[in-house]
Amino acid sequence: MNIVYLTTEAVPFAKTGGLADVCGTLPKVVAAQGHRCAVIMPAFSSIERSLQPIETTDISFAVPMSDQKLIGCRLLKSHLPKDPNDPEDSAEVPVYFIDQPQYFRRPSLYGDANGDYHDNAERFIFYCRAAIIAMTRLGYPVDLVHCNDWQSALVPALLRAASDNVAKTQPIATMLSIHNMAYQGNFGFDAFPWTGLSWDHFRPESFEYYNQLNFLKTGVVTSDVVSTVSPTYALEIQTPEYGCGLDSILQGIPQPVAGIINGIDTNIWNPETDPHLKRNYSVVDWADAKIDNKLALQAEVGLPQDPDVPLLGLIGRLADQKGWDLILPVLKQHLAEARPTQWVVLGSGDPKIEEQLRELTEQHPEQLAAYIGFSDALAHRIEASSDMFIMPSHYEPCGLNQLYSLRYGTPCVVTKTGGLADTIVDATPENVAANLATGFHLNDSSAGALDHAINRALQLRYHSPEKWKNLVEFGMSQDWTWRKSADQYIQLYARTISLNRRRRSGS
């Protein structure tokens, strides 16, 4: 298959979140299975900091954004970097950048301290149209376009309208992956003329959404297949609670929403070779090594060194969506009652949460170490050294930290939502007895439920050490590699192409 990935983020060229990890890795793994893959993304300023060689191609063209506005651009080219230590990472995946400085050479990808850029609708309509032209100018066949999030979600509709002629000569299948329903690209209807289409196309079955231009909704109703990043999230976004206004539309599309869990880079996240750890370990010798790593981390962050005290780790954005409205009451209760627990926190976000953590750290330095900001090395050490990882998100499309934790032998306490529900098996008596458990679910999204789940974990850890050992080792043995995810995507790509051909033939 010939597959083109459309994305605004891909490591190491541009990143604000997990989308970059997906689009920087998935195309390489798919290509390694014998498929031809390429990535097309905007030439943001950040590409110059990627340390990857970037060359100028001889391809340039203009996009008529209106009768009076012709916007020119050129294509730059690089490749997704290969890991020299991974013999399976051998496929060459070209990355083409749409270089239009007026739109894309800015300090940030989507906005600044004042909010989203005022011309985001124009910027990403241009990107969608330019990407279609680029596919034509590059000159090789395209079987499927894999669009990611709202910024590229107009492409399926534009291809159906054959606005730039490419779809008239190539029967291109389209798939849209939703990484977070909350971001939809909703703009006023006055942005529609930038698509280059007549107002006849501004209809509810394509671009129009309550007299607005909603990029994501347009992609949902015009792509051949819609996917998201976990089976549970695929179901959740079809409910009013999680659908962000598009739940009924998702329920009504011809094909069911697919859910595929993201993989993790098991070369970077590998406790056997991780250079950030005091002592490396595997599933057969983890127990003593985790104690050594724990003592080293306690010393590093200023907590009293004690191999027996339970160490609870938290990494990520400090926001209520990540469950901090639950975590803070439980944390304060543990500190006020001087419960025998230690907490280590790494993250940034809501200034009010940051300030509370600073104050609590000053008041209880023997129990809490909070680092505001981010350190990749410290994140690795927290994953490896903690006795359990706390992740009570209110919604989590996929989640990665719980997968890192499993690989590092650190059971997770999570809410039963999205990818957390799909990847963490609750330690019920039945699951523990069957050796299937990998963590602990909250009974509901409340501080009391979080405290109860933590207590369940502590009880198993300190009163049933053999069961805890089984739980840790079963978690470490799970396969969350990108190869597993890529195999599922390849099957979905083949089905999407078949569906597209049947739709075009009318069968």
UniProtKB/Swiss-Prot annotation:
BP-aspect Gene Ontology terms: glycogen biosynthetic process
Catalysed reactions listed for this entry: [(1->4)-alpha-D-glucosyl](n) + ADP-alpha-D-glucose = [(1->4)-alpha-D-glucosyl](n+1) + ADP + H(+)
Record's protein name: Glycogen synthase
The keyword Plastid is assigned to this record: no
InterPro entries in UniProt: Glyco_trans_1 (IPR001296), GS/SS (IPR011835), Starch_synth_cat_dom (IPR013534)
Coiled-coil segments on the chain, per record: none
Any one GO molecular-function label of the UniProt entry: alpha-1,4-glucan glucosyltransferase (ADP-glucose donor) activity
Pathway linked to the protein: Glycan biosynthesis; glycogen biosynthesis
Organism of provenance: Rhodopirellula baltica (strain DSM 10527 / NCIMB 13988 / SH1)
Pfam families per the UniProt record, alphabetical: Glyco_transf_5 (PF08323), Glycos_transf_1 (PF00534)
Transmembrane segments: none
Job description of the protein: Synthesizes alpha-1,4-glucan chains using ADP-glucose.
